[in-house]
C-alpha cells in the first residue's frame, strides 16, 4: 500500500506544482500586459507632447514672421513719406530760388545796360543751372531736357 500512497502523493505534488506554475505564468502574463499598456500610454503621451510642442513652435514662428513683415511695411511707409516730404521741400526751395534769381536778374536787366546786363544773365543762368542740378539730384527732370547740361554715363 505504501507504493499506492507514494504514487498518490506524487500525483498530488505534481498537480500542485502544475497549478502553481500556471498561476505564476498567469501573473507574469498579466504583468507583461500591464507593462505593455503602460509603455504604449507613455509613447502616446510623448507623441502628443511632441505634436503640441511642434504646433506651438510653428505658431510662434508664424507670429514672429508676421510681426517682422508688419514692421517692415511700417518702416517702408515711413521712409516713403519722408522721401516725399523731402522731395516736396526741395522742389519748393528750388522753385523759390529760381524765382528769386529770375526776379533779381530781370530787375538787374531792366535797370542796367551792357556789362550789368551780362552779369545778370550769367547769374540767371547759374541759378537755373543750380535749380536744374537740384531737380536732377531728386530726379524731377526729364532726362531728354538735361542731356546738354548733365551728361550721364548710363548705357
Swiss-Prot record:
Induction conditions: Up-regulated in response to water stress.
Sequence repeat start and end residues: 53-63, 64-74
Annotated region (2 X 11 AA approximate tandem repeats of T-A-Q-A-A-K-E-K-T-Q-Q), positions in chain: 53-74
Tissue localization of expression: Highest expression is found in seeds. No expression detected in adult tissues.
Superkingdom, natural source: Eukaryota
Alphabetic keyword roster: Repeat
Compositionally biased region (Polar residues): 97-120
Segments of this protein annotated with the region Disordered: 1-155
Entries under InterPro entries matching the protein: LEA1/2/D7/KIN2
Biased composition (Basic and acidic residues): 11-21, 28-39, 79-95, 144-155
Composition-biased stretches (Low complexity): 40-78
Transmembrane segments annotated in the record for this chain: none
Family statement: Belongs to the LEA type 4 family.
Protein name: Late embryogenesis abundant protein 2
Organism: Cicer arietinum
